[in-house]
Amino acid sequence: MSSFVDGQSRPNVIIVMADDMGWSDIGCYGSEIETPNLDRLAKNGLRFTQFYNTGRCCPTRASLLTGTYPHQAGIGHMMNDTGLPGYQGDLGNDVRTIAEVLKPAKYSTYLSGKWHVTPKIHPGSSQHNWPIQRGFERFYGTIHGAGSFFDPNSLTRGNTLISPYADQEYQPEVFYYTDAINDHATRFINEHDGKNPFFLYVAHTAPHWPMHALPEDIEKYKGRYDAGWEVIREARYQKQLELGLIDPKIKLSPRDAEPWKEAKNKEWEIRHMEVYAAMVDRLDQGLGKVIGALEKRKMLEDTLIIFIADNGGCAEGMGRREGIQYQDSDPEILRPMKATDLQMDMIPKRTRDGVVMKQGTEVMTGAADTYHGYGRAWANVSNTPFREYKHWVHEGGISTPLVAHWPKGIAPKLRGKFEHQPAHLIDLMATCVD
């Protein structure tokens, strides 16, 4: 990635990662989802058309953090130890993280968001691979990889597991994890002493399932997806052509999901994409706060901001069975949780106020007591124009948008342009260290 990097300077570096977001899910890559802040960064920066991840949450994070292939970092797959080299499911001690390299070089190192490179998440378990022990000076986020956006599991500040409802340092009117991640990223910038440059890793869980969003954001997308997935996919493809993002020789890949006219639960399916869009929209809103903090402190000019996703859109069938399923066999006896209770379940049995968690086609998604994925057909839209999904090593699984913004380091003639040079996650650490 040396084509736009000036090796003489020491800029601040911010890497923002979305979770389970497809190649076409932001405006500057063809989406109808409103992402004005990312679009602004793209207009004044660079967009990569052939940037690749590893197709799955944990391997991507291991590769990003260490600048090595995931097997070299010990996480060739997920968080289970198979007994085979490269598959211990825990970040190796024989690799150094980007924070461990930048910190001795007098960079301040901050992380807000998802970690997901160790299985050791429970109280009393080893913290040797938690962020503070791997080079980050400040950390707020989740050690595990997925969970409720209204009550995320393994939420941690520094080295201490916390409940969002008993956290004296952060008490918003409504807790929503995407906001919490962006608010803490903004806090780290505001509280940075300015003596040295900083590295900030902003690792979102949005728009990974569950489909959780705030009502006002969902309302914004009401009716936007009534035409169904084929129409939305075609519109994205046409916008990509108009933007010059793809060569006209690239055609839409064959679909492997049911036609919209055969969808059994159209209203239910539409709701999923409305919520998904709201999740991406909210992520972008928070990015606007981060950019605003940089502008207020006059840091934007010499801050390299990189936005990527960990893998393509996800076709997993989370919570999509017919009917209604409860996460507890006797939902009537559930009791509210205490504010101090730690949430350690990826799929909680209940909300904080004691409402049972529900899944299935008879449950409209979006609220704290629901838990769904948006399914194969919408994931196919997310990955326009490619085929396959997260898990696969086809373009739909491993292609990610990459937006790079650095006013002081990217030449004016390159701004708003596309970079067609292929690149991979392992290039990011080397680029930052250089």
Language model feature labels by segment:
Residues 3-434:
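Formylglycine-dependent sulfatase
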